[in-house]
Amino acid sequence: GGNTECFWKYCV
């Protein structure tokens, strides 16, 4: 937890 940008199932 603590991601800022998520695309589909990939979070960075």
Swiss-Prot record:
Pfam families noted in UniProt: Urotensin_II
PROSITE patterns per the UniProt record, alphabetical: UROTENSIN_II
GO cellular component, one term: extracellular region
GO molecular function, one term: hormone activity
InterPro entries, per database record: Urotensin_II
Signal sequence coordinates: none
Disulfide-bonded cysteines: 6-11
Swiss-Prot/TrEMBL keywords: Disulfide bond, Hormone, Secreted
Compartments, as annotated in UniProt: Secreted
BP-aspect Gene Ontology terms: blood vessel diameter maintenance; regulation of blood pressure
Domain of life: Eukaryota
Role, per record: Urotensin is found in the teleost caudal neurosecretory system. It has a suggested role in osmoregulation and as a corticotropin-releasing factor.
Family, per entry: Belongs to the urotensin-2 family.
Name of this protein: Urotensin II-beta
